[in-house]
């Protein structure tokens, strides 16, 4: 799984189910694929979205700014700055500065995520604010590691508030991961269908999978309900690849 897929998984885990979540999932997919190149339009769209908390908007704004190429002098957005100020708590800012110094020495996505997980969501948001306001610079991978750790802390607190048993791997994040991987698998099937005799069949299976994922994101589902989705998709893909004589390894 590429780290961008992981970022999409974690970010979606903190967004309430509904049509807006499906829309955000599509925007993230487009941004990571390099299809959405107007940061100003994207940020204006984000600013006016209902339902989302200021912090969620701040995190999404941070992700979009990291990913979409922009002019050097492009002004930072106030709604993102306000969301990433750690609630104005000096304690959060002190911890954010300490974390930033550690992240500056880190170069990997997973390393940054591990370091960040020992801090509170407030301190993590403040650290994102430092980077967003150009007061500090880290690699893009490290910044995304910080994003994922923040989302994990938020998802954990949301999960606890649902009074469900907290396990080592958050069910909300596992659920989003299955959804993202199912969507990725559907894409692989569409790509393979290009010049084959079974193209129509593959495209139909992929299309059904995409519709199912879209419906589940829009309607909202319990984390356990997506468990069979990815497995069904992978079985369909494997059966199709077997007929085509294609090695599964290429698409893992």
UniProtKB/Swiss-Prot annotation:
Q: Which organism is it from?
A: Influenza A virus (strain A/X-31 H3N2)
Its record classes its membrane topology as: Peripheral membrane protein
Which lineage is the organism of this entry classified under, starting from the top rank? Answer: Viruses, Riboviria, Orthornavirae, Negarnaviricota, Polyploviricotina
Q: Where is this region: RNP-binding?
A: 165-252
Q: What is this protein called?
A: Matrix protein 1
Family that this chain belongs to:
Belongs to the influenza viruses Matrix protein M1 family.
- Which Gene Ontology CC terms are recorded? host cell nucleus; membrane; virion membrane
- At the top level, the lineage of the source is Viruses
Which Pfam families does this one have? Answer: Flu_M1, Flu_M1_C
Name its cellular compartments: Virion membrane; Host nucleus
**Any extra remark in the record?**
Most abundant protein in virion. When expressed alone can form virus-like particles in transfected cells.
């Amino acid at each position: 799984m590429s780290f961008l897929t992981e970022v999409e998984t974690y970010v979606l885990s903190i967004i309430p189910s509904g049509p807006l979540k499906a829309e955000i999932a599509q925007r993230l997919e487009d941004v990571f694929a390099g299809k959405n190149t107007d940061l100003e339009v994207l940020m204006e769209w984000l600013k006016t979205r209902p339902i989302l908390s200021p912090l969620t908007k701040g995190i999404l704004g941070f992700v979009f700014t990291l990913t979409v190429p922009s002019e050097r002098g492009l002004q930072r957005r106030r709604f993102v700055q306000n969301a990433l100020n750690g609630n104005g708590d000096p304690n959060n800012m002190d911890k954010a500065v300490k974390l930033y110094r550690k992240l500056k020495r880190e170069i990997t996505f997973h390393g940054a995520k591990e370091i960040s997980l020992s801090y509170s969501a407030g301190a993590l948001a403040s650290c994102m604010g430092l980077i967003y306001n150009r007061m500090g610079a880290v690699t893009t991978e490290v910044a995304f590691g910080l994003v994922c750790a923040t989302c994990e802390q938020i998802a954990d607190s949301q999960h606890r508030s649902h009074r469900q048993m907290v396990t080592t791997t958050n069910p909300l994040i596992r659920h989003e991961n299955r959804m993202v991987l199912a969507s990725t698998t559907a894409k692989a099937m569409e790509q393979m269908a290009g010049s084959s005799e079974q193209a129509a069949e593959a495209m139909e299976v992929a299309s059904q999978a995409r519709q199912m994922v879209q419906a589940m994101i829009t309607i909202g589902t319990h984390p356990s309900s997506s468990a069979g989705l990815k497995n069904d998709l992978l079985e369909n893909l494997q059966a199709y690849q077997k007929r085509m004589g294609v090695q599964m390894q290429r698409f893992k």
